[in-house]
A protein has these predicted regions:
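Cationic, low-complexity basic patches in intrinsically disordered or flexible, solvent-exposed regions
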Residues: 19, 31
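Ser/Thr/Pro/Gly-rich low-complexity, intrinsically disordered segments
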Residues: 1-2, 11, 20
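Catalytic core of pol beta-like nucleotidyltransferases
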Residues: 48-70, 77-150, 160-248
Length: 248
């Protein structure tokens, strides 16, 4: 009888016993490869689930820091990594994920106080938008999105023909301000004029930041985000928010 797995030659017949062993080894190797491939799929799924779970945990820690300490999202994400003992190069949750976590945190822990605080901040924003009306002010950030608390600052984006005109207006009205540089909505450095302004409703000094943009930037600023939401609102839009008590 010819040997298995080798062929029908006399040599194969002589090596019959060995050829059977080789066949067994070949089948065993194929089984091991198939088993490894089968086991690898759940491993990949598990890894993805773990990464998703970690990202959610980072987002919830970030949300707590944003709401309870008034941190901006970028610094809050980095602080969350340190608090969790994670490497600085750990993948961070995106802003949509953080915003969802912030809304959830507010709903659970701040539902009784946050709406009043948000309204007070929007009223303060409206005051400064009316004062800076010649410079086409738009409200952005947490106060516009509806996730602000009393620890949040107000961010107004001005679109000016002359980048120095808004600063001159503050000087003419004897308003103290601190010039600084912040990150703009395209990731570029933008000049900002920071003011401390008292909110009568909160009885606190709130940071109001006037970000100076060129008039040509206004068209791009009005484009909605990937979910169709408006990123910022003009004077009329903020007035409607205060009248309707709804979020954008």
């Amino acid at each position: 009888m010819p040997g298995l797995c080798v062929g029908g030659s006399p040599a194969a017949t002589i090596l019959k016993g060995k050829s059977i062993d080789l066949c067994k080894e070949g089948l065993s190797s194929q089984l091991r490869m198939a088993t490894h491939a089968t086991m690898r799929v759940p491993s990949v799924v598990t890894a993805v689930a773990m990464n998703t779970s970690l990202s959610e945990e980072i987002a919830h820690t970030t949300a707590r820091l944003v709401v309870e300490e008034g941190l901006e999202w970028g610094p809050a994400k980095r602080r969350a990594l340190r608090e969790m003992g994670l490497p600085a190069r750990t993948s961070l949750p995106d802003n949509d994920q953080v915003e969802e976590a912030v809304r959830e945190y507010i709903q659970i822990f701040c539902a009784d106080t946050q709406p009043r605080e948000l309204r007070a901040l929007r009223q303060l924003a409206l005051v400064w938008m009316e004062r800076m009306a010649p410079f086409r002010p738009h409200l952005g950030g947490a106060v516009w999105r509806g996730t602000a608390t009393r620890l949040s600052d107000v961010y107004l984006q001005l679109f000016c023909d002359d980048p120095k005109s808004a600063e001159i207006a503050l000087i003419d009205h004897h308003v103290d301000y601190d010039p600084r540089t912040v990150t703009g909505f395209h990731g570029e450095p933008v000049e900002a004029l920071s003011i401390g302004s008292k909110s009568p409703e909160l009885n606190e000094i709130i940071g109001v930041h006037l970000l100076i943009y060129d008039l040509d930037d206004l068209r791009g600023a009005l484009k909605p985000d990937s979910k169709g939401r408006t990123r910022r609102g003009d004077l009329a839009a903020v007035r409607r928010l205060l009248e309707e008590k709804t979020d954008p």
